[in-house]
């Protein structure tokens, strides 16, 4: 397995023959140079979407069509993409699990908000996170979220080894909040922070997270640099 940060809340996760793009944001992403877009997305087999905000969905339609990759996420949102955009989709709901090749993906709650499109007048489904299981590892992708009591059962039931946690503050947990959640609700071996550094109003360093979790391998990701497990 390898996990590649594409900046902000976007990731490329490679597990065996499956290549999952998580909330891929290319257009306007200040952390991912245009000449890196092809390498970031080539060969993707599925696109996983946590919620509808522009910095998580700006490129989903174009990518799904060009890559011929199904979009995976909450049922209501996927039904919209299928009906309005003609995309291939895999829709499911909270607590459900779908199989993508040798990878199992479960949908879990997040604590945020969601809307989609230029008018952004109404939510389509709700915000979510993912549990991704493959190659002996279980990864929790928090999506955009604050600290939530839902994390209690997520940690207890799925027992993820790796946590990809939104931790930039303002719109999500900050580093101290992410550390609190990791200590209280999970037993991670590895934590990868995200949704930070992108804008000035977000946290620029993971120092508070690292200092608060001395027994966890906290990896500050570098854009387009693989983290291998």
Swiss-Prot record:
Keyword Protein biosynthesis part of the UniProt annotation: no
Coiled-coil residue spans: none
Keyword Hydrolase included in the entry's annotation: yes
First and last residue of the signal peptide: none
Pfam family of the protein (one): Lactamase_B_2
Top-rank taxon, per record: Bacteria
GO molecular function, one term: hydrolase activity
InterPro entries found in the cross-reference section: Metallo-B-lactamas, RibonucZ/Hydroxyglut_hydro, UPF0173, UPF0173_UPF0282_UlaG_hydrolase
Keywords: Hydrolase
Family from the record: Belongs to the UPF0173 family.
Protein name (record): UPF0173 metal-dependent hydrolase RD1_1994
Annotated organism of origin: Roseobacter denitrificans (strain ATCC 33942 / OCh 114)
Classification lineage: Bacteria, Pseudomonadati, Pseudomonadota, Alphaproteobacteria, Rhodobacterales
């Amino acid at each position: 397995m390898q996990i590649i940060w594409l900046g902000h809340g976007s990731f490329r996760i490679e597990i065996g023959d499956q290549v999952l793009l998580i909330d891929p944001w290319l257009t306007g992403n200040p952390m991912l140079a245009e000449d890196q877009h092809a390498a970031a997305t080539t060969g993707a087999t599925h696109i996983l979407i946590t919620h509808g905000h522009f910095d998580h969905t700006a490129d989903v339609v174009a990518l799904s069509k060009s890559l011929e990759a199904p979009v995976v996420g909450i049922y209501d949102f996927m039904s919209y993409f299928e009906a309005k955009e003609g995309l291939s989709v895999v829709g499911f709901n909270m607590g459900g699990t779908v199989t993508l090749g040798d990878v199992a993906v479960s949908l879990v709650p997040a604590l945020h908000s969601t809307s989609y499109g230029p008018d952004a007048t109404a939510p389509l489904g709700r915000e979510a996170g993912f549990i991704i299981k493959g190659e002996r590892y279980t990864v929790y992708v928090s999506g955009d979220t604050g600290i939530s009591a839902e994390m209690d059962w997520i940690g207890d039931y799925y027992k993820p080894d790796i946590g990809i946690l939104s931790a930039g503050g303002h719109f999500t947990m900050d580093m101290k909040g992410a550390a609190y959640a990791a200590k209280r609700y999970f037993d991670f071996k590895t934590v990868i922070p995200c949704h930070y550094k992108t804008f000035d109003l977000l946290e620029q360093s993971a120092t508070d997270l690292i200092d608060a979790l001395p027994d966890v391998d906290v990896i500050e990701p570098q854009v387009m640099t693989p983290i291998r497990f």
